[in-house]
Amino acid sequence: MILAIDIGNTTVALGGIKDGRVCFVAHMDTVRTRTAAEYRAEMEKVFSHRRHPERPVRFEGAVLTSVVPQITGALAECARHYTGKKPVIVSPEIRTGLTMGVPDPHAVGKDRIVDAAYAAANFPLPVITVDLGTATTFNVVDENRVFRGGVICPGLSTGLRALGERCAQLPQVHLSSPKNAIGTNTESCMLSGSVLGTAVLLDGITARIEEELGRPATLVVTGGLAKYVTPLCRHPLTYDPELLLKGLALLYQLNAPQQHHYHAGGHKPHGQNFRRHRPFRRERRETEAKAG
């Protein structure tokens, strides 16, 4: 089993992945002042619930991505504790199967690289990934596997929280999918503007990207808030809540020391004689179409 760690602005996601299948997912709060020992204590709580005397949790290796540099080292130390090996840390220098077509690859969020790499390996090209989290991010990979860049917007919950904090007469609202575009009270108006507004954003930005690419693109959506938004989208899409964790496992396959794995999407990196090693199943080419 591979230990995948995704350090986000709000939460740290831990995933156990075996043979391309996500076996478990757990979350911890992202606390920038925690030490490695404190994070290890939190991880111990997570793993203690999954231990069995006859089937202990064992990790053959770890892979880590982070958008919070202050705690990357602490979580990397934790990963090494549980695996006995240095983790694969996502950066522009590792094998991804992509060509970075942006001026400064180091400025691209590492989670964006992970999403794009997995989507490019498993879906028809060109492909657009959208991650609905603290920020809403779009990533674009063209038909030649070139990472072209993307779009960054305030996240759905970030916008709702800002309204509640900055507007004295607007309440905090619990997320749900609005039934109508026209709200009849303050809460339903806010939900329509935020949730339906995000769905329209996805449709509109995707259409503009397709115009610039000069051809239709596959749309893949992930993130904890996507379940509220995707039913309202009109562009055909695939929703995969585990996209990033699967992407981390793919990058582990490509970069783990002394291991030679074939690329999950069938793309063989130049200069490497990879043998096939239990690749991820290729996602169905059909995408789900949901209309608002």
Language-model regions: role of each:
Residues T33-T35, I94-L98, L243-G247:
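A short acidic, often aromatic-flanked loop/helix-cap motif at beta-alpha or helix-coil junctions
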Residues M43-G61, I205-A217:
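Phosphate/pyrophosphate-binding loops at sites that engage ATP/ADP/AMP, CoA/4′-phosphopantetheine
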Residues R51-A107, N144-G150, G155-L156, T184-V195, ...:
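Short beta-strand-loop/turn "lid" adjacent to the catalytic site in phosphate-handling enzymes
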Residues I2-K45, R55, V146-P171, S176-N180:
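Short glycine-rich, Thr/Ser-proximal phosphate-binding strand/loop in the N-terminal lobe
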Residues I2-D6, V63, V127-D131, V220:
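Short glycine-aspartate micro-motif
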Residues K85-R166, V195-R208, G265, R275, ...:
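Phosphate-binding/catalytic loop of phosphoryl-transfer enzymes
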Residues I2-A4, L160-G292:
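ATP-binding/phosphotransfer module of carbohydrate and carboxylate kinases, centering on a glycine-rich
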Residues F47, F123, Y252-A256:
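Short, hydrophobic alpha-helical segments
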